[in-house]
Amino acid sequence: MSRYGADTTTDEVLEGIDFSGKRVLITGSSSGLGEESARALSAKGAAIIMAARDPQKNEAAAARVREKVPGADLELRTLDLCSLESVRGFAKGFLADHPRLDVLLDNAGVMCCPRGTTSDGFETQLGTNHIGHFLLTGLLAPVLLDSAPSRVVVLSSAAHLITGMDFDDPMFERRDYDPWQAYGQSKTANALFALELDRRLAEEGVSAYSVHPGRIVTELGRHMNEE
């Protein structure tokens, strides 16, 4: 039985672990779990790349991290997962600057937002939560392989139980849009992606995991009502 539970903190999970010399890239670092991951991992010596869509919010998050972890090794970069052009530009810049990546934390996401599409025409939740990360991870695969043993952690959710993938209409073009169905589908995609990525790359030293973070009040739930 796991010794961790609903009250377990990030610091308790990382007790006794040294991340000195490790480089960790976190998407969605400007708030919530991304910001907390940056704080906890930097406190253990990791060099953190904080990647987020809004540079000002990312700067504010980094300032909060540095207040708690003086001397934290933080690098801030702009990444918009709703734009494949942005993802490609981000990956190109990262690979040019960094020959090593030990951990990729695919954390950024949206939940239960109104119907919409990304700049590339994908349904917003599937496009942001899965497709953007799918491309990012693929583009960074060479540096992950060069840095092996390395790992990819994909933030999925127990919401994957809501629905599987509707491969006939993944973008809700021929059915009524339901924000929970769309969110659940994106989380199923996250989980399936991590499983297949691990199957393909584990023997080469890149492990992939999908995780359910639990019910945590963060900015992710901004589209939900109080109930």
Residue ranges and their predicted role:
Residues 2-225:
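Rossmann-fold NAD(P)H-dependent dehydrogenase/reductase core
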